[in-house]
Design a protein with these regions (language model features):
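Catalytic-site neighborhoods of secreted/periplasmic enzymes
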Residues: 85-191, 231
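Short, well-ordered alpha-helical scaffold segments within catalytic/effector domains
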Residues: 3-5, 111, 195-203
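Glycine-rich, histidine-containing beta strand-loop boundary motifs that form or position
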Residues: 76, 128-129, 156, 218-220
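Active-site segment of extracytoplasmic enzymes that catalyze sulfate/phosphate-ester chemistry
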Residues: 21, 25-28, 32-127, 136
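Boundary at the C-terminal end of the N-terminal hydrophobic targeting segment
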Residues: 15-17
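Sec-dependent N-terminal signal peptides
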Residues: 2-13
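Active-site-proximal cap/lid insertion segments
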Residues: 21, 30-56, 158-197, 203-286
Length: 286
């Protein structure tokens, strides 16, 4: 993948008449491809509209990027989990070669990222948003190991915070309880809601670096859970009824009817019984 990235960048330099192209990477977190119009076009109806035809979200800006550029329809993550997939993205290596094959394992010091290569070629490099490659730190603002991202003031290691603010000591989570950061919305508005806040900071950086070649990565922590958002978006789709996917109904029906020993009849010969139904990773991935 690393070679592919740089072949792509080199090809862009020819497209732009030998000039160094600017690079902007916008990354979202657990974003179901069915929520993007540009991907629904490539799916069968039963896959594209698993929640119903009347409940889809329109994504005109993302769709226009796909139409005017290119869209990957055969692109797979070596590990569809946060830390390892991010490690692969910035390094071009398989997760097991980065030191980060599972969540919360820090990237090896020896890893060379695309940002480091571009920085050495004169690019202004910056990173905003969720990083998740610096171990357990949470939120972990501006890690000391920058991996080529010269400006990482607005990089935080992990967490899905909903409210940010600036202080004299730098950025911090705005929603707090007992002076500790929480995932609550708090008083988040169009200036402090996490996505809005990060986008505003990215625009400031783009304005600062506009007269030089730049590479900026904006890693938005949404739409990963908790599934909370500021108004007007919080109530925007309250009137819609989402259909449960057919495959989910089938699986739940099978679970409902099995196993027989869970019933009172099936367990009558047990003097004492403890029934535990445990679910792993039950959140809807969007």
């Amino acid at each position: 993948m690393f070679r592919i990235i740089f072949i792509f960048l080199i090809s862009l330099s020819y497209v732009f008449g030998g000039k160094s192209p600017n690079v902007i990477i916008i990354q979202t977190d657990e974003h179901n491809l069915r929520t993007l119009g540009c991907y629904r076009e490539y799916m069968s109806e039963d896959q594209a509209f698993i929640w119903g035809k009347d409940v889809m979200v329109e994504t005109p800006h993302i769709d226009s990027l796909a139409k005017d550029g290119l869209i990957c329809t055969n692109y797979f993550a070596a590990s569809p989990v946060c830390t390892p997939s991010r490690a692969s993205w910035v390094s071009g290596l398989y997760p097991q070669a980065t030191g980060s094959p599972s969540n919360n394992l820090p990237l090896k010091d020896s890893i060379v990222t695309f940002a480091e290569v571009l920085r050495k070629r004169g690019y202004a490099t910056s990173y905003l948003g969720k990083w998740h490659l610096d171990g357990d730190a949470k939120p972990g603002w501006a890690p000391s190991r920058k991996f080529g991202f010269s400006d990482n003031r607005f990089m935080f290691n992990r967490g899905h915070w909903k409210n940010f603010e600036m202080t004299e000591d730098g950025p911090r989570v705005g929603a707090r309880k007992n002076n500790q950061p929480t995932y609550d919305l708090g008083d988040a508005d169009e200036k402090s809601f996490a996505t809005d806040w990060l986008v505003d900071r990215s625009l400031e950086i783009l304005e600062r670096d506009k007269n030089k070649p730049f590479c900026m990565m904006l890693a938005l922590p949404d739409p990963h859970g908790p599934n909370t958002v500021r108004e007007p978006y919080d109530s925007m789709y309250d009137h819609l009824v989402f259909k449960q996917p057919v495959t989910m109904r089938k699986v739940l029906a099978a679970l409902r009817n099995q196993p027989g020993w869970m019933s009172t009849e099936g367990g009558k010969n047990l003097v004492k019984k403890i029934q535990i139904i445990q679910n792993y990773s039950g959140g809807v991935t969007i």
